[in-house]
């Protein structure tokens, strides 16, 4: 399975269809696109009502109402719906993606599924931190324990809560 997962916030919901359309128009189609929308936000007073969510005439798009985990909602909101040994690509709601994004990620994933991939990686010593805005791809098998890690370490640590690139 190939999943794409993202989240949105109140100020960006009305324009999120541009990003979703770019994901639906990929040369290699995803099996499912999750849009994870918190029922209420920790960072904003506003909420997104169901009526504000754009309709997508494609059964590949699934809206998931969930807890606000900051930008990490893009992953954690759909985590329990993912099959093992699948590719998940994390995306942002304010980017329009090149139509080859999924195809490129899948190509490299098929060569080495134990690795994570991003189109831009920040070097940090002997490590690299993938920038999620450009897309971040990982095997779902690598996500064991990430929700527990979020609950124990990230949830109450503002700097991590707001910067999912550091902990996903």
Identify the residue ranges that each predicted region occupies.
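Conserved nucleotide-sugar donor-binding
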Residues: 129-151
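Conserved donor-nucleotide/metal-binding helix-loop-beta segment in metal-dependent transferases, i.e.
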Residues: 99-124
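Short, acidic, metal-binding catalytic loop of nucleotide-sugar glycosyltransferases
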Residues: 19-31, 39-40, 54-55
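N-proximal low-complexity "stem/linker" segments adjacent to membrane-targeting elements
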Residues: 1-25, 34
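Active-site-proximal specificity loops/subdomain of glycosyltransferases
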Residues: 36-86
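Short beta-strand-to-loop acidic/aromatic patch adjacent to the donor-nucleotide binding site
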Residues: 85-96
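Acidic donor-binding loop at a coil-to-helix junction in glycosyltransferase catalytic cores
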Residues: 160-167
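Short loop->beta transition adjacent to catalytic acidic/histidine clusters or analogous donor-positioning motifs
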Residues: 2, 24-35, 59-61, 86
């Amino acid at each position: 399975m190939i999943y794409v997962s993202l989240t949105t916030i109140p100020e960006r919901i009305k324009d999120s269809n541009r990003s979703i359309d770019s994901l639906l128009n990929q040369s290699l189609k995803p099996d499912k696109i999750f849009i994870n929308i918190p029922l209420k936000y920790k960072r904003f007073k506003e909420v997104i009502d169901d009526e504000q969510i754009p309709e997508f005439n494609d059964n590949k798009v699934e809206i998931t109402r969930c807890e606000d985990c900051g930008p990490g909602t893009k992953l954690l909101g759909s985590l329990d719906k993912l099959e093992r040994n699948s590719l998940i690509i994390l995306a942002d709601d304010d980017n329009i993606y090149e139509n080859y994004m999924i195809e490129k990620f899948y190509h490299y994933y098929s060569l080495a599924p134990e690795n994570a991939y991003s189109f831009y990686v920040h070097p940090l010593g002997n490590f690299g931190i993938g920038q999620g805005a450009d897309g971040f791809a990982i095997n779902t098998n690598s996500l064991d324990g990430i929700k527990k890690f979020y609950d124990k370490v990230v949830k109450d640590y503002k700097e991590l809560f707001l910067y999912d690139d550091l902990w996903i």
